[in-house]
Amino acid sequence: MEKVLRKVFHESERIEVESDLLGAARAVCQHQEGLACILGTGSNSCLYDGEKIIGNVPPLGYILGDEGSGAVLGKLFLNALFKGTLPDGMKEDFLQSSDLSYPEIIQRVYRQPMANRFLASTSLYISEHLDVPALRDLVKENFRDFFHKNIAQYVRHDLPVGAIGSIAYHYRDLLQEVAEEEGYKLSTVAKSPMEGLVAYHAY
């Protein structure tokens, strides 16, 4: 990757190729210690010392882990939808608005590629119906699991938490609520790391 980039940016003195997690950490924590999170289709987190990652709880992917992610939120939503624990009429409304049937959803999840992206796509419907308490509770449950199973493992309540990604960004108010309830300070939330990375490298 570095060789490819150097062909394009041949006048650059220095080219770094690092992980998306380090990019997220630098974007939200800059040169300070902190807990950095990615909350998008998948999820990840790390303990960051202001320069490098010094701790990482493995996210395990959407089947075994990825708490806080869009894929897991989709799993929670579809489970509640078809098991009848959401308000009356919501299942019919979702199926109509998504132009999907129950068999088609099962097909997309179990027999087609990129099931995680399909599951995460249900977030659009959820975000448009956040006036429904049951859906707000699902979003908060997803974030709470993320804090309990990932962030809490770093045992650093003293550090600020920063988050990158579409799920963090679109549900930032609920993420803020959960962070405070769990005893953390949410410092920065951004949809993309780009602006933060520009600031990091300009310093």
Model regions and ranges:
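Phosphate-binding/catalytic loop of phosphoryl-transfer enzymes
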Residues: 1-89
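ATP-binding/phosphotransfer module of carbohydrate and carboxylate kinases, centering on a glycine-rich
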Residues: 3-9, 28-35, 76-203
